[in-house]
From Swiss-Prot:
Name by which UniProt lists this protein: Protein SIA1
Cellular component GO terms held in the UniProt record: cytoplasm
Lineage: Eukaryota, Fungi, Dikarya, Ascomycota, Saccharomycotina
Signal peptide: 1-28
Domain of life: Eukaryota
């Protein structure tokens, strides 16, 4: 009996000691959960876009947000200095779910810790994520070192056995918050494992990452200079679509990007000719965002067909053949737009051939299902893209007037020879926008683009026509455009080209006498560039030639991109065909 009491007493003491030990060792975890439950983490306050604030990324990690946390956009978690600090979920403004994983009562996200302009310390300069083994970027980096007989490629090392320090950017001292090996024990040259498959490279804040974005979908394409993929199409358990993550670096030096391309942002709302001719590529009605489905045209029922991918390759091929100086995307870029569609991923996919070739481009609006709220967000994202000319439109629209200039022989001596107009398909607003610009006598190579056709695209009786003209239904859903059509003539615009009607890829001559208008004008269609089961994907090209003094146009088809069709004169000073 006495012996049993002693055993019970020792058991109680051992249990109390075990409870105390467990409490002490778990206190940091308990403190983290209590603080996330009871204390709201501060919001990330920005004046303008994150790219322009001077904030860099101090650290990156994957953390679990539990159901009892007060907020998952901003959480309390431990820094490398063992302080509870605020971490922010990447791409908080995105409507789609950007979680990496989920379980009972928790969801995991990629979080980042900001390094503010008034703070000292090192920043993350490169990132990689892989759930299975070493990320490909790290493996390639080590392979290149070994290939170049760099001894650093064969081993890992640090300044000491227990610590690795990075020098502070503002002084020559080492930053004491970089005790990587002591905390994690895993590092590879300049790369450090941060758990859950994340690898970080740290360096001076001047080289630090400026922004991290998430993209949802199977066919994400990253083509922007200054941006690099952290992970491509990471499969997520319990989710139908993978996630890709990209980040924006501060400098281009670390990128293997074509040095021949002009990566400088266009600072003036104008276009400068580089040679005697100027080509414009019109892309219309892409309808991107379709699901990946089985290909009914193949015998195997499990064969996969991506609706959008052949059309991206089609645009690539046309650009290789034509080398255009400007790309104009005339509307209806989404297929059945809804809030679950990651429009950023779709836009990057459609402009990837354009951006990768360093071609200036612009969008005209033509999304009937998109509400005003989404329109603002979509246009703001479009305006942020490199080489995009829509940034010069200060309103939430796609109205643009871009002078076409000859190269300056001396500073300030550029001569305007033409004008490119883009309209937003609202007839009244388009009229008011165009009316405020005086006609320049020197500007003769003038073209206009928008998504919807004008009423004058339906002439009566016999008329000149070049191309396919299959859709001839009523345009009563469009307000009367006669005054706008006359104004186009008064401004000496030689042609206007639209999209919208997939069955039409022609140019119709709008006869001034027949339609009781002030002049003749070619009214063109770009055709459908996206996938359409009934119609062949096409693009239209306009060429302004200052040596021949004419404007010509033709089309290329996805069926054979090496051939052109329906070559025609739009205007010629010699032939005076207008």
């Amino acid at each position: 009996m006495f012996r049993n009491r002693r055993i019970l007493l020792y058991a109680r003491r051992f249990f109390l000691v075990w409870i105390c030990f467990l409490f002490i060792t778990s206190w940091s975890l308990i403190q983290r959960h209590l603080k996330n439950w009871l204390v709201q983490a501060p919001d990330l306050k920005l004046s303008g876009s994150l790219q322009d604030t001077g904030i860099k990324v101090r650290d990156v990690r994957i953390s679990k947000c539990y159901s009892w946390f007060s907020n998952c956009d901003a959480i309390w978690d431990y820094s490398l200095q063992d302080d509870l600090v605020t971490w922010y979920r990447i791409d908080m403004g995105k409507m789609q779910d950007t979680s990496i994983g989920q379980g009972f009562g928790w969801t995991s996200y990629v979080y980042w810790q900001p390094l503010y302009p008034n703070e000292r310390g090192s920043a993350v300069v490169d990132l990689a994520l892989s759930r299975n083994g070493l990320p490909l970027g790290l493996a390639n980096e080590r392979y290149n070192k070994i290939k170049n007989n760099d001894i650093d490629g064969y081993h890992v090392h640090s300044n000491t056995d227990n610590e690795f320090y990075v020098k502070d950017d503002s002084s020559n001292r080492f930053n004491p918050d970089m005790k990587w090996s002591a905390k994690f024990g895993n590092h590879l040259e300049d790369w450090f494992w941060r758990g859950d498959g994340i690898w970080c490279k740290y360096g001076r804040r001047s080289n630090g990452i400026k922004e991290i974005k998430a993209f949802i979908g199977e066919d994400f394409i990253e083509s922007r200079p200054m941006w690099k993929e952290m992970v491509h199409c990471l499969h997520r358990e319990g989710y139908s679509k993978p996630i890709s993550i990209s980040f924006q670096k501060s400098r281009l030096d670390d990128f293997t990007y074509g040095k021949e391309k002009d990566l400088s942002q266009i600072s003036e709302p104008s276009l400068v000719m580089k040679r005697a001719d100027f080509k414009i590529l019109q892309i219309s009605d892409l309808h991107f965002g379709r699901h990946i489905v089985s290909d009914s045209r193949k015998e195997k029922p499990d064969s996969i067909f991506r609706y959008d991918w052949p059309n991206v390759q089609f645009i690539h091929s046309v650009i290789r053949n034509e080398r255009p100086d400007l790309a104009v995307i005339t509307g209806h870029i989404f297929k059945d737009f809804n809030k679950n569609l990651d429009y950023e991923s779709q836009i990057l996919k459609m402009v990837s051939p354009i951006i990768s070739n360093g071609i200036p481009f612009l969008f005209t609006w033509g999304e009937p299902q998109v509400t005003t709220e989404f329109k603002v967000n979509i246009l703001n994202f479009i305006k942020s893209l490199p080489f995009c000319l829509n940034k010069f439109d200060l309103k939430n629209s796609t109205y643009l007037m871009l002078p076409l200039l000859l190269p300056a022989k001396t500073p300030g001596s550029q001569k305007q020879i033409g004008t490119i107009f883009a309209f937003d398909s609202n007839v009244t607003e388009s009229y008011n926008f165009l009316d405020k610009f005086p006609r320049s006598p020197q500007s003769v190579y003038n073209l206009a683009f928008q998504h919807l056709p004008l009423h004058e695209y339906r002439p009566q009786g016999s008329f000149a026509l070049i191309g396919n003209y299959e859709q001839k239904g009523s345009l009563d859903y469009i307000p009367h455009t006669k005054a706008f059509r006359n104004l186009l003539g008064e401004k000496d615009i030689k042609a206007i080209s639209c999209g919208h009607e997939h069955g039409n890829d022609c140019c119709v001559l709008s006869d001034g006498k027949q339609q009781n208008l002030k002049n003749n004008m070619w009214l063109c269609y770009g055709g459908v560039t996206g996938y359409d089961q009934a119609y062949e994907s096409k693009v239209r090209i306009f060429k302004i030639d200052t040596e021949k003094n004419d404007i010509t146009s033709w089309k290329r088809s996805i069926k054979d991109t090496s051939k052109v069709s329906d070559y025609q004169y739009i205007w010629s000073r010699t032939l005076n065909t207008q």
